[in-house]
Amino acid sequence: FLPVVAGLAAKVLPSIICAVTKKC
Protein backbone atom coordinates (compact mmCIF):
# COMPACT_ATOMS: atom_id res chain seq x y z
CA PHE A 1 0.00 0.00 0.00
CA LEU A 2 2.62 2.52 1.06
CA PRO A 3 4.86 2.11 -2.02
CA VAL A 4 1.82 2.79 -4.20
CA VAL A 5 1.00 5.94 -2.24
CA ALA A 6 4.62 7.06 -2.40
CA GLY A 7 4.70 6.49 -6.15
CA LEU A 8 1.45 8.38 -6.57
CA ALA A 9 2.71 11.26 -4.44
CA ALA A 10 5.91 11.37 -6.48
CA LYS A 11 3.76 11.78 -9.59
CA VAL A 12 1.26 14.27 -8.18
CA LEU A 13 3.42 16.48 -5.97
CA PRO A 14 5.49 18.08 -8.76
CA SER A 15 2.34 19.13 -10.60
CA ILE A 16 0.83 20.53 -7.39
CA ILE A 17 4.02 22.46 -6.62
CA CYS A 18 4.06 23.62 -10.24
CA ALA A 19 0.49 24.87 -10.00
CA VAL A 20 0.95 26.55 -6.63
CA THR A 21 4.34 28.19 -7.14
CA LYS A 22 4.02 28.70 -10.92
CA LYS A 23 7.50 27.17 -11.19
CA CYS A 24 7.61 24.29 -13.66
From Swiss-Prot:
One of its GO terms (cellular component) is extracellular region. One of its GO terms (biological process) is defense response to bacterium. Its main location: secreted. Keywords: Amphibian defense peptide, Antibiotic, Antimicrobial, Disulfide bond, Secreted. It is found in: Secreted. Disulfide bonds join 18-24. Expressed by the skin glands. InterPro entries: Antimicrobial_frog_1. It comes from the Eukaryota. Antibacterial activity against Gram-positive bacterium S.aureus and Gram-negative bacterium E.coli. Belongs to the frog skin active peptide (FSAP) family. Brevinin subfamily. This is Brevinin-1SY. It comes from Lithobates sylvaticus (Wood frog).
